[in-house]
Amino acid sequence: MAQLEKFLENVPTFDERGNYQCTVLVWQDAAKERFFAVVQDPRCNLVGKTPADFDGERVILADLFPVFVPGLDAIKRVDEALIIAEDYYVKRHIMAPCLVEHSPVANQMFKDTVAIEVEVCHKLMHLEIPNIAKFRGCVVHEGLIVALCFDKYAETLTQRVMRSASSLNKAKVMDRLRTAVSKLHDLGYCHNDINPANIMFASLSDDNPVLIDFDSAQRMGHDLLKVGTPGWCVEELRTSSQENDEIALRNLDEYLTSCGCR
């Protein structure tokens, strides 16, 4: 086995009743191969630990990640040198839940979730919408899309409200977000997970909100592959719907008012 480098995931998993099941560790070696181990420790402390301390099983990436297809309108392929030079944020989808289930259905759902996020972000990228996270392309390994690259942002709306709620112009924030969501709807997609953690700002002084995280996005009327955040979405809805986004925006407006935003 190649020299082990770093942990990528340390994720506790729970059943439908909220009972702890296990903790899944995922790591990557120098050859970019990924491995996972399941441990029975809800507080799994990795201080002083290395992947070599665990009996890992190789992750079959082809079971989980979509194929990168080059072409005229292809998704841009981003290499590590560019990621470092441009200081991009690299989003790696959390594999732990489907690794626990370890079924063809769970694997395909994970693969489809990655694929739809790439599809949505690629289409949005060409519209140059200032209030939607700037997608820069994908990290490709062995012909598979294993991560997405975006511009980095400084803090979430949750963090901004905790730090300086009174400095936020609620009307401006909501107007910009509604415009961004409207553009998404015009393309035939819904976000389905609008909440304060999925809204960011480019710097600590910037007041221009940016909508991020499109792994719950889906074409209107299609079944959701990943449901939104409880309390911010219509939890009983299992299809992609403008209603999900509209309710989330209303909840967001009320949230900002309750936090004392001007």
Locations of the language-model features?
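Conserved structural core of kinase catalytic domains
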Residues: 89, 94-113, 122-125, 131-171
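ATP-binding glycine-rich loop module of kinase domains
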Residues: 32-126
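Short, glycine/acidic-enriched loop or turn micro-motifs at the edges of active sites
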Residues: 154, 196, 216-218
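Short, hydrophobic/proline-enriched secondary-structure or compact coil segments at domain edges
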Residues: 16-33
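Conserved alphaE helix
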Residues: 169-183
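C-lobe/activation-segment region of protein kinase-like
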Residues: 94, 112, 203-262
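Catalytic-loop of the protein kinase fold
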Residues: 185-202
